[in-house]
Structures are given as structure tokens and as C-alpha cells.
Amino acid sequence: MYAIGCHGLKERAIERICRIKEIDPRKNNLSIICYDLSSISEYAKVDNNIFKLMKHNLPGPFTFILNGTNRLPKIFRNRKEVGIRMPDNNIIREIARLLDAPIMTTTLPYEEHEDLEYMTDPELIDEKFGDIVDLVIDGGIGGIEPSTVV
């Protein structure tokens, strides 16, 4: 499933994806995608048990809800927890590695009556959002399974 995302440490970029999706970042859940386990520990508090669980299951389709660190953007400092992901998708993880920063992400905006197919097809995503986002990355047809929250 495709998502909308931005540089995870740039406040204006985060505000922009929230405007596109019409959500309030202080009230709605956004997740951060990290490149590897060591980068996860920069943005979330990871104890030994959680580390072992993450090491066994990541990269993979999981979102871990963890206590955040003070390295998160100001928008999230009033929140105790943050959703952390390290998906089994080399494209997005490589972008995070090259940026040396997490990717802030949320599901694509959609209406309840819409076919979810557009969330899996980069060409359909480009038709719908190409004028309001900077870039649509074509990683091929995706699945529609959301991540499991841990």
C-alpha cells in the first residue's frame, strides 16, 4: 500500500502532508519510517526486549508504538508515543538512509466510497495526487494490507 511521506525532521514538510490529508498532526497518528534499527533508537526509546522483537521482525509489515525521544519534531513533543516502521521496502528505506533522517508518513487520503485500488497503483496515484505532491515514486503495484500495530 502506498503512502504519502516527507522528510521526517522538516516541520514545514510535515505540515504540508497534513494539509494534503486534511489532518491535525497534533491529534492524528503519523508514523516514521527508519532505515535501520540504530536509526530507530534515535527517535524512540527501545529497551532490550523491544530490540529483540524488532530485530526478529524487521524489516517487515509492523508499526511499533514506542515512547518518543526529544529528536522528534516539535509537533510531536507533547505526545508520549510514536509509531515506528522499518518496512520491507528497499526504496523508502534507502531514501531514509540517503537523507540521514526518518520519513514521516501517513496513508494516502481517500474517501470511504473510493476503490482502494488507487492506493496500490502508482499511475493512478499520480493521476490523483501528481499536481499536489512533489514526486510519486513508482515501486510497482503494491498490496492493500496495512501494517500490524505492535
PLM segments and residue spans:
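Active-site-adjacent structural elements in enzyme catalytic cores
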Residues: 1-150
